[in-house]
Amino acid sequence: VQLRFKERAPARATLVDAMRMARAAGAAVVVNGDLALALDLEADGIHLTSGDLRRLSARPVPPDLWCGASCHDADELAHAVALGVDFAVLSPVCATASHLGAAPLGWERFKALIADLPLPVYALGGLGDADLPQALSCRAQGVAAIGAYWGR
């Protein structure tokens, strides 16, 4: 489970409750883009934004914590590999309402970008359950989504 807040994080008690529920269900919890918050909450890891990724010269957490990264191109994927992240999320594969105007990669480009990578990569961007077979056929670890799952 990824806790992601683009504006302002909810109250600490709300985050602690969310982590408790996720862990009770057997899920690990990573915090998106806020290393200090991830460490304060004793989360299971951090998910780096592409901006965070570009600014780093070393993995920001020890190997016992998850470290993921958002990537949008070959350079960001290469940097994620060099930092030793555990997984990447590559986007946008398709057009998405959450990032209007972003040029979609398409499945062929997605497949080419991840073909030789030594880490799992999730597909993101305008995707949902119906896209999982296509993602898997392109060697993705799976699909990640916001809108397709959040509104359920």
Give the residues covered by each predicted segment.
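Conserved, mostly hydrophobic/aromatic
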Residues: 1, 38, 80, 88, ...
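A short beta-strand-loop structural module common to alpha/beta enzyme folds
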Residues: 1-8
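Conserved beta-strand positions in the central sheet of alpha/beta enzyme cores
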Residues: 2, 30, 47, 68, ...
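Alpha-helix-loop-beta-strand connector modules within alpha/beta enzyme cores
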Residues: 12-33, 50-53, 57-73, 103-128
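Short loop/helix-cap segments at secondary-structure boundaries that form the rim of catalytic
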Residues: 37-44, 56-63, 78-83
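Structural motif
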Residues: 41, 83, 116, 137-139
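Glycine-rich phosphate-binding active-site loops on the catalytic face of alpha/beta enzymes
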Residues: 49-59, 87-101, 126-152
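Histidine/lysine/aspartate-rich catalytic loop segments that bind and position anionic ligands
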Residues: 67-97
